Amino acid sequence: MIITQKKPIEEVMALVGDAKTVAILGCGSCATACQTGGEAQVAELKKALEAAGKTVVGTAIADYCCMSLGVKAKMKPLVAAKPDCVVTMSCGDGVQCAAKHAPGIPVYPSNDTMFLGEAARFGV
């Protein structure tokens, strides 16, 4: 699995910048196991973005953000909502895969990719 850690929220907000509308894509695999991109973390980021005055136009969690077909299906409604940007809660490969399916829309990472490894337990 790919081990990720959350970027500080200030860094994510700086990436989002002046965007008014944001979509969020989480990862149901590695990032969920690392507690950096599962349902709880997507909800946490949504709350933080809304507290900063952003409108979250959609959220989704792909089974694996590194698998193009699954990401394509999850990105379709997010892209249709016409966000100013997408924040992807996955490893760097997931960010690249999401960007492939969001032409013309900036896609930003909320995580730092650390290394290929294994988790001792969820979140560790």
Each language-model region and where it sits:
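Iron-sulfur-associated redox domains of electron-transfer enzymes in respiratory
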Residues: M1-V124
